[in-house]
Amino acid sequence: MAGTLLQPVALGTTFAGRVSGQRWKSHGTRRPPSMLAMSLSRPVKMAAFVGLRSVHSFSVTPVTNFRSTVASYRSRRGRRARFVTRSMFERFTEKAIKVIMLAQEEARRLGHNFVGTEQILLGLIGEGTGIAAKVLKSMGINLKDARVEVEKIIGRGNGFVAVEIPFTPRAKRVLELSLEEARQLGHNYIGSEHLLLGLLREGEGVAARVLESLGADPSNIRTQVIRMIGETTEAVGAGVGGGSSGNKMPTLEEYGTNLTKLAEEGKLDPVVGRQPQIERVVQILGRRTKNNPCLIGEPGVGKTAIAEGLAQRISTGDVPETIEGKKVITLDMGLLVAGTKYRGEFEERLKKLMEEIKQSDEIILFIDEVHTLIGAGAAEGAIDAANILKPALARGELQCIGATTLDEYRKHIEKDPALERRFQPVRVPEPTVDETIEILRGLRERYEIHHKLRYTDDALISAAKLSYQYISDRFLPDKAIDLIDEAGSRVRLRHAQVPEEARELDKELKQITKDKNEAVRSQDFEKAGELRDREMELKAQITALIDKSKEMSKAETESGETGPLVNEADIQHIVSSWTGIPVEKVSSDESDKLLKMEETLHQRVIGQDEAVKAISRSIRRARVGLKNPNRPIASFIFAGPTGVGKSELAKALAAYYFGSEEAMIRLDMSEFMERHTVSKLIGSPPGYVGYTEGGQLTEAVRRRPYTVVLFDEIEKAHPDVFNMMLQILEDGRLTDSKGRTVDFKNTLLIMTSNVGSSVIEKGGRKIGFDLDYDEKDSSYSRIKSLVVEEMKQYFRPEFLNRLDEMIVFRQLTKLEVKEIAEIMLKEVFDRLKAKDIDLQVTEKFKERIVDEGFNPSYGARPLRRAIMRLLEDSLAEKMLAGEVKEGDSAIVDVDSEGKVIVLNGQSGLPELSTPAVTV
């Protein structure tokens, strides 16, 4: 912390003693000022370091000043110099540095040209936040009293301060003792607590007299410091006296966490189930050699929980005698590697760790993400952690539990057979829904305490079931636990909000405060006084409302009554917000929307009752939860002639029920006519361009799992596409090029095809031409059977057999074409309204459009061309000529010769052939 020195610092043996006013130990007389000035002009040397450059404000002094100061002190007398390693300086913590800087400031304040033990004591008290400051404060020692005592003992200096403020020999001794104390405690840093321990251990000097004057007991202070840094007085006393810490494990304590201790303190979550896995782990740990289980499973299935469960069993004594009394220590590999700047540091740390484990014989090491051992610490010519640990793992000297995912195990550990044979794999499967419910019940109390609310049984059951059904890219119980956690957070935030009445009063308060300030600026003090009184009144009302709300919540919690409650609806809301799939119960508004779906779709799709009804039935079935959960919502193939509304129906459904036409995933299958383009659906294979981008179909469905998927012109696709779609239609799943399973269970699949168009054209001449209903219906049935036969010849039977329904669209009648014409004309009117032009057309013009646009073989597309030619082209010419401008109204009619005329409604118009109408 205090800086890194690349070379040992050579420090001289001479030392400038205390300044004028203080006796020198080698002389009985005071030193004259000339000698003092001469001695101060020379560099000051000491065994550790001499001091720091003076600063006027500690808070703005960067740490680099401390480093550069320490690094700059080198002895000019190299032969007689004593070398001190860099380890002492680089181990100072930020708080220890602050203590030294404050000690220097105290020396300047008192006018002393030295830093003694008393200044270090004042620095320890003044630092305020460290362990040393807290202990001294608890003993009743404050900075003011300590300063008074220091001045009583040594007085004030003459105010002359040298550029470099040195440490006295006794202060230097305190720093050396603090390093020893840190080592004996097993710490690789020097903090404020170690400086205080060094000060107490020195036992003499001004600081000891100050503490004695203030009534502090040094042994009591030491005991409190030891207690606060987690050690016992006896252990440290033995370490100090004997010079060896015996059974202490400083490296393991620094880089590991004792799970057994956490279990004894009740800080671990309860582990429910997993009995077979825990028993297998215990069996492997009891082996003589290669006693290292490796937990392998998908992310989130509870691998770490098994290690925690073992620690809990050990803490309660519910284990065989072979591992009774052992400690489960989880190793932080990141912390172990961090800071190893020089070659050999990482290996040294790891070897120390292994030695401590071997000597203890009661440690079970748990390494989460055990694959990080491979390559950890490896550099040019260095050995990684896995190779260092291999001998100990094989001989049984080190009991290690590893945990990793299946993918990481395959990528890293299986590639190294020597490491793989040292670990015994323990498969951790994903728990079932019922097991997950039991796990959630076991965790319920912890989450209720954290969120300060209660969970119903229905909430826990729905969390397990809904997460299993709708969240497909994660694993139980992790996703179910996350659901109840976020639902608890949502409910807690909802109940913690300010009451609505208080919010309204707060708005009024802000306005009154603004008006009051304005009145003060305009010197209308009478009005400002009235507003101030109103402001105070509102503040009191808001405070009273908030307090009342808090009291009610507290009373509800204490009485065990209603209070915040997480129910099934809250879980459903979280699932919907995660996935976009509506799983909440159907509201009354949505019920009306679903029941009137046919009517709404017919506003855009004219005719085609069979298709509209089939689509509506499937959506209603899925929304109320009656569909097969392992298949898509529905899968249709729309066959029929071109231009009758097959693609339009899919767009209308997406716009009406899913929010917008953009909510639909549309794939034009004419883009997948060649064999090599088929892979674009699921992603390019490894080694090909586009592998990292994912598939067009799979990525779109992963991002939006609840949607309409339209495969337009399906018969244009390469035959390999149909092979790929078999598992989508049957099981609602597809695996992309990266091996990820994409869920299609909440998609509505629509395929359009023109197969059978020729059959419809030949057999449909009678359809819609003044036939009675029975004749129309029988003709449609006959045509449908012919189209289905033709589709069977084109598509493979296993593909057709997986479809829910094959719907044959009818040819459009002239009456239906007229209705479509009105819809298309309305679109033109809306575009002109944006340009502030009001357009009207006559009935005669409509009939002209229908006559030209009606073609049973081509559907409604000729109608669009007729509107473009007869209406849009004529109108564009008039607008360019300036005859129709913004703000005008235009009327489109047909004259006696059949020509289209556009008349400006602002001028006098001749009598129209038929009344003008708007759509």
From Swiss-Prot:
Q: State the source organism's domain of life.
A: Eukaryota
Spell out the residue ranges making up region: Repeat 1.
92-157
Which SUPFAM superfamilies did the record assign?
Double Clp-N motif (SSF81923), P-loop containing nucleoside triphosphate hydrolases (SSF52540)
UniProt keyword annotation of Secreted present: no
Q: Which residues form the UVR domain?
A: 506-541
InterPro entries, per the entry: AAA+_ATPase, ATPase_AAA_core, Clp_ATPase_C, Clp_N_dom_sf, Clp_R_dom, ClpA/B, ClpA/B_CS1, ClpA/B_CS2
| Region II: start-end pairs | 566-757
Q: What CDD domains does the annotation carry?
A: AAA (cd00009), RecA-like_ClpB_Hsp104-like (cd19499)
Locate the Clp R domain: which residues?
A: 89-231
* Region I, residue ranges: 252-499
This entry carries the following GO cellular component terms, namely: chloroplast
Signal peptide boundaries: none
GO molecular function list: ATP binding; ATP hydrolysis activity
**Region (Repeat 2) spans which residues?**
167-231
**What protein family does this chain belong to?**
Belongs to the ClpA/ClpB family. ClpC subfamily.
The protein's name in its UniProt record: Chaperone protein ClpC2, chloroplastic
Organism of derivation: Oryza sativa subsp. japonica
List the top taxonomic levels of the source.
Eukaryota, Viridiplantae, Streptophyta, Embryophyta, Tracheophyta
Q: Which gene encodes it?
A: CLPC2
